[in-house]
């Protein structure tokens, strides 16, 4: 029998690129239409009024305005809303 193990290759040495997920614009901040509010995997946050969702579940503003976060429904789902700029209070 062999007294030493064969010199196999290492199983380490690789890493995935960062995905840059998370909230990009916080509550109370102004935003322009088309700007990303949240990058996420799955629906951690749900789109509310004036917010759209991309195929990768990213949330983006449909109108210029002010971002707000809230809770919606019986299941207490966190939602993201954009108040249009005309009716948004000054910051």
Curated annotation (Swiss-Prot):
Recorded GO CC terms: cytosolic large ribosomal subunit
UniProt cross-references to Gene3D superfamilies, sorted A to Z: 2.40.50.100
Disordered, as annotated region: 1-20
Alphabetical list of InterPro entries matching this protein: Ribosomal_bL27, Ribosomal_bL27_CS
PROSITE patterns: RIBOSOMAL_L27
The entry's keywords: Ribonucleoprotein, Ribosomal protein
Chain intervals with Gly residues compositional bias: 1-10
One Pfam family matching this protein: Ribosomal_L27
An MF annotation (GO) of this entry: structural constituent of ribosome
GO biological process, any: translation
HAMAP family in the cross-refs: Ribosomal_bL27 (MF_00539)
Family named by the database record: Belongs to the bacterial ribosomal protein bL27 family.
Protein name as catalogued: Large ribosomal subunit protein bL27
The gene coding this protein: rpmA
């Amino acid at each position: 029998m062999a007294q030493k193990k064969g010199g196999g290759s290492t199983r380490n040495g690789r890493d995935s690129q960062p995905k840059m997920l998370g909230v990009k614009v916080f509550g109370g901040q102004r935003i322009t239409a088309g700007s990303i509010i949240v990058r996420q995997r799955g629906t951690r946050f749900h789109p509310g009024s004036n917010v759209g969702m991309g195929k990768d579940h990213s949330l983006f503003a449909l109108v210029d305005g002010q971002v707000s976060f809230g809770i919606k429904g019986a299941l207490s789902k966190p939602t993201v809303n954009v108040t249009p700029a005309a009716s948004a209070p000054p910051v």
